[in-house]
Amino acid sequence: MQISLEQLCAGKATKIKNKEYFTTKDYVMPFIDRMSKFTDKFEIQVKPADQISLNSDGEMNFEDIVYNRVWVEAQLPGEYAYEGHTQSVSLLYALDTRKPVYKIFQNAVRSACLNMCVFSPNMLQVRELESETAMDYSFVKQVMELTDNTRVMLEQMSNTFIKRETIFDNLGHWVDRCISSKFNSGFGTVKLAESTAIDAYKQLVVDTKSDYYTAEGDICMFDAYQAFTDIVTHDKGRDIVNKFEKTYLVAEVLGLPQVNNI
């Protein structure tokens, strides 16, 4: 669910399993203050607690609400962009996971479709969100200073093609890698569903209405990547916690080289 900054900052403090957690504002404003040096554009997604109160009009009461999952995305301005893509730095936290966690990460976003692009695990930091303890925001400065090699990967994919006669074999490899590939940051294992590979395959060679459909000839690796990341990015809010990890796994499933950011 997308909301405004004002609505976000109304999030109440909460107690989970006898542990006290701060208000939403206490967690997000130090991040927003740091990123406001670079941008004034923030996108916010949340998942409220399962039990919510309604006002007299039957609408969600934002004056009495707890957000269990929060994603604040700071969208960087033009000087950080490159053709067809922008960059963003995000703070994401979840209180209702097995261990409450928070993540700070940088990724690229394709302007035309808002698909995430992730090629380096070094752009992510994951920490346990301990009760009655402030977050450590130092990685914000670090990630802004890392060299972003996304442009190199995008150019490489644009010049790489999958031979059409091998697409059936590739589907088998993709499904196998979805089964075997995993991302573990120390707070649980993240995987791509096998159906992700099948759905991406359909977008590439079956669904004629798909933006990534290739009617004839070889298939551009860039389109294959976008078909996968479209599924991960636009999952109707089912999983906002692990989008970075799942998007990174797309590159692994497609057999793309890992990027090391310095």
Predicted regions and their residues:
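A cross-family detector of function-defining hotspots
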Residues: 58-63
